[in-house]
Amino acid sequence: MAHINQNFLKLPGGYLFPEIGRRVRAFSAQNPPMPLIRLGIGDVTQPLAPAVVDAMVKASREMGVKETFRGYCEETCCAYDFLRFAIRDSYRERGVDIADDEIFVSDGAKSDCGSIGDIFSADNVVAVCDPVYPVYVDTNAMAGRAGDYDGEKWTNLVYLPCTAENGFFPELPRERVPDLIYICSPNNPTGAAATCDQLKTWVDYANAHGSVILFDSAYEAYISEEGIPHSIFEVEGAKTCAIEFRSFSKSAGFTGTRCAYTVIPKELVREGASLNALWSRRQGTKFNGVPYVVQRGAEAVFSPEGRAQTRAAVDYYRNNARVIQEGLTAAGLTVYGGVNAPYLWVRTPNNTPSWDFFDLLLKQACVVTTPGAGFGPSGEGYIRVTAFGDAEATWEAVRRITSVL
């Protein structure tokens, strides 16, 4: 008889977003005429930049000609040189020297954040910020690192509370020393962005204890304030303790196109093994690379035209964030984030439980948000609102929300 991975049976009933989808479908089935505005799941609404589309069209035509057809990508790290070089140069513009063979192109930061555990022992102690992007937790639970779920927390995880009192940035753990430390900045879901000094504290800690920081930088394109690092490798010492994940999804609208990249410096060594080499071995075995057409589209993001066009889309979402922040604040709600991130972390009124406030906004305002409790215990009493909607819909959502408070 085939035996299953028992860790899957420990997972709670449903991943956060499918549960939201279930409630939304149930409401829509009972109220078919009601037009919903979705400010929950962080999917973009603006189309791909013209420069990206043109590059993909050109690449598609190349695939239809024998002389320019591309099959499996046999170049380094399952990625074409043209894209890795463009990514490398973008780092160098910020004073970060990354070698092209330290860049691994993939089909999404979610995939890489979820799969990076393949190169680490199941015995590693994992630390996650609380609230936290659920993928970090669930993938480690699947791998057997999380222990058992007690209805609120996993018994083997180290939770790092991120609250209004500490500026939504975690303090160093006082008890167990984690081996793997997940940090997301700008943060999903709170919208907070870490300073160099804050990250340096964690870099020094990781280097002192031999830990590895798994740094999710998927939203760095939304940083608007000076002094906020776009990469953890802007922090001295990070190359010996950190892996960075980035994505084209929110910076260039690739949620339906799928392209991202992970940076693993060759200086990052644990137990005598290069993590760069281990990940290369893992990817070579389990991943055949992102399609040539998509990689050409991603390359175009770094062209002068592509940069200007994708920046315009980012600014569009930033303006949505401003509208949400100003509108909900004027209505008396406490709102965090939205300045360096496309997410706003909104305190529920009168200590209303997150799911109750989610249901109220769904049923009375026909607006879909994300309950903070779905991101962990410290998320209770908040909802996450995304700035990825259409501008007109965002204005209308704010009007609807304020009308039911």
Explain the meaning of each model-derived region:
Residues H3-D107, V301-P304, L405:
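N-terminal small-domain helix-loop-helix segment of the aminotransferase-like
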Residues E67-A206, E220-V235, I243:
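Conserved core of the PLP fold type I
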Residues D89, D97, N351, L360-T369, ...:
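PLP-dependent enzyme catalytic core of the Aspartate aminotransferase-like
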Residues Q295, E299, V314-Q325, V335-R347, ...:
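Conserved glycine-rich beta-strand-loop-beta hairpin in the small C-terminal domain of fold type I
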